[in-house]
From Swiss-Prot:
Record's protein name: Probable GTP-binding protein EngB
PANTHER family: ENGB-TYPE G DOMAIN-CONTAINING PROTEIN (PTHR11649:SF13), MSS1/TRME-RELATED GTP-BINDING PROTEIN (PTHR11649)
Upper taxonomic lineage: Bacteria, Bacillati, Bacillota, Clostridia, Eubacteriales
GO CC annotation, single: cytosol
Protein's gene: engB
Domain of life: Bacteria
Residues at which Mg(2+) binds: S37, T59
């Protein structure tokens, strides 16, 4: 897939604000500061399309980006950020759940985890939740530029075993800094995204 144009559409906090044009959507989810916004900027070739911050929890709404005037990338609020109130965490969780459960346009979910660390309890819960609802899942281990060469195999094993990744799901390393994994991810995202709609 070649991304020729990308456009920020809306930051939504409730379903009434979601786009209503029924285009295919692919969501990006992960812990706060997992690198979702940076990843979106890299694969769209736009340095500032998605707002990035060194402060975890910057994304507090559901951000929709129209890609090639054909489908949406959806940047979801990060989870597991300890420095916000319980009520804020619950509000973010409810917002994400409301979107993920009821959005029939949603075809794929990209789950981002930090390649340097064992997935957290929240990462495991998120993966299990995604699989419970039957979504096609791509696990992207970010910040791979921080790994030593001999860390890749070991960390891949730890991540896949901790999450108990299903055989049908894809796993890959990615770096927003050196852009490794960019083409592979774009190829995976493009696989069959319009086939179901064509059949209907």
């Amino acid at each position: 897939m070649i991304i020729k144009n990308s456009e920020f559409i809306i930051s939504a906090v409730r379903p009434s604000q979601y786009p209503v044009d029924n285009r295919v959507e692919m969501a990006f989810v992960g812990r706060s500061n997992a690198g979702k916004s940076s990843l979106i900027n890299v694969i769209t070739n736009r340095r500032k399309l998605a707002k990035t911050s060194s402060t975890p929890g910057k994304t507090r709404q559901i951000n929709f980006f129209l890609i090639n005037n054909e489908f949406y990338f959806v940047d979801l609020p990060g989870y597991g950020f300890a420095k916000v109130s319980k009520s804020e965490q619950q509000k973010w969780g409810s917002m994400m759940e409301q979107y993920l459960i009821n959005r029939h346009q949603l075809k794929k979910i990209v789950l981002l985890v930090d390649s340097r660390h064992k997935p957290s309890k929240e990462d495991v819960q998120m993966y299990e939740w995604i699989k419970y609802y039957g979504y096609e899942t791509i696990i992207v281990a970010t910040k791979s530029d921080k790994l030593r060469k001999n860390d890749f195999q070991k960390n891949r094993k730890i991540i896949k075993e901790t999450l108990n990744i299903r055989d049908e799901d894809k796993f890959m390393f990615f770096s927003s800094l050196n852009k490794s994994g960019k083409e592979e991810l774009l190829e995976i995202l493009s696989e069959g995204i319009f086939e179901e709609d064509t059949m209907e």
